[in-house]
UniProtKB/Swiss-Prot annotation:
It comes from Drosophila melanogaster (Fruit fly). This is Organic cation transporter-like protein. PANTHER family: SOLUTE CARRIER FAMILY 22 MEMBER (PTHR24064). The chain crosses the membrane at residues 22-42, 128-148, 159-179, 190-210, 220-240, 245-265, 344-364, 372-392, 401-421, 428-448, 463-483, 490-510. It is a multi-pass membrane protein. Residues 43-127, 180-189, 241-244, 365-371, 422-427, 484-489 are extracellular. Residues 1-21, 149-158, 211-219, 266-343, 393-400, 449-462, 511-567 are cytoplasmic. GO terms for cellular component: membrane. Residues 555-567 have a biased composition (Polar residues). Glycans are attached at N55, N67, N89, N97. GO terms for biological process: monoatomic ion transport; organic cation transport; positive regulation of cell growth; positive regulation of multicellular organism growth. Keywords: Glycoprotein, Ion transport, Membrane, Transmembrane, Transmembrane helix, Transport. Residues 310-320 have a biased composition (Basic and acidic residues). Residues 304-326, 546-567 are annotated as: Disordered.
Amino acid sequence: MGYDEAIIHLGDFGRYQKIIYFLICLTSIPVAFHKLAGVFLLAKPDFRCALPFENGSSYDLPTHLWNLSYPENERCSYYDVDYTEEYLNGSIPRSSNETKTCSSYVYDRSKYLNSAVTEWNLVCGRDFMAATSDSLFMLGVLLGSIVFGQLSDKYGRKPILFASLVIQVLFGVLAGVAPEYFTYTFARLMVGATTSGVFLVAYVVAMEMVGPDKRLYAGIFVMMFFSVGFMLTAVFAYFVHDWRWLQIALTLPGLIFMFYYWIIPESARWLLLKGRKDCAIANMQKAARFNKVEISDEALSELLDEGENSEEKAKQKLEDQELDEGPPPSVWDLFCYPNLRRKTLLIFLDWLVTSGVYYGLSWNTSNLGGNVLLNFVISGAVEIPAYIFLLLTLNRWGRRSILCGCLVMAGLSLLATVIIPQRMHTLIVACAMLGKLAITASYGTVYIFSAEQFPTVVRNVALGAASMVARISGMMAPFLNFLATIWKPLPLLICGSLTLVAGLLSLLLPETHNKPMLETIADGERFGKKTKADVYLETGQELRAPEAQPLKGSGETNGSTIANGHK
């Protein structure tokens, strides 16, 4: 009852909700722009040292000049010799094998006109700086999810969404005009923080616009708009070849969303939570009029009161329970009991691998060879069928089966790219994209699966901790791709191995589909644990179990026991 019941009386997912939902989903597109722009902003083309006798030369050199100038497989130094005409035409041998470190570079501009890497020479001893910049962007995403999440709960969804968009535009433009690396990196960190502010708030508002039976679809369609933004990033990169103008071009569409301040209503759920019932009813009546539904303020108020009373009773029951049991359970309680600890570590591993591999693959398209833009578009496009697959199967198949199957498929596909001969380029890209499709489906599954594994008393904080693990792995992803400088297939080898292991270990987690939600720490400890009672029942033997000890948060009073199996 309550707000969910009121939504149904307003026309459920009526015309008003559809329009607002669509407008909210559009904000996911610029979020994708900024999260994936680093592939082109920090693109690293082929390069070589600029030789002393060169002045504005092109990247290409005749083979004999290359052999005379550079040691084998070396791009960061050249032979320290006198490059006379006689030496260059081969008339005299090389006088020394001593090398000299580059002072300037020549870049291959056949794929990229320029990038932040070519402008600030982020190669050789400075090549880690490009990965560091992307990693700090993901640090911004982590910080933004903490800061903007709390602010939206305190001040409302609408003002924080608008503030995030304004800050995003300002720092997005600053990144495009940054005079040097550190200003650029700081601006990108701030943009990363605002992507959380925009996407997190938009996602919450989108979910609050619909009833419980449509939230699965609402959440996945938001992600589909992110995938559209993924692909559109390549379209911008195709037409805008200068990295500075590309950054600005990807930022300016955010100005369109400034008009949302006068269009998007404040969340009715948030207004009710803050006791602003009259404002919530006014917003809901606006939706009713747009949907051509007639409902009186009194009827709406009665529906909301019923929900409010139910929530207050549940809250009071929880408070009374906490007083009886002492301090409320925390995320640390997940590590105090063996079965809960095992499941928690497995879930954290799934989040770590899924997030790291997702971003690693998204940013690794330039290392696959061939047409970088085409690889990038395909990498975004394969996310759509992944989400459609989830829509069709999440409520039909087991969560564990989907998560395990998708992770194993991703692992095998990525490992296949390592053993396929390099000349079979199309097959390598196809396997990598199949891996991307599977890891995207895993990403969509792991959240629901995790929420059903954790007890209610610690569910929110546990999911927050799991999300934190995912953000940390996202920060590691740029350095994972950096390993391609050692051996090109190494990132895919690591991603494939980790994903395969995580998928197989997921079989150790209990299935949650069509199972009741866990309420207490004791429920969480028992769930998926094969007790002596189960063993005796399977063998037909009589069970005489000793009295079990109470678990924290079990819902039992002090001194009582929890039955460990059947009587």
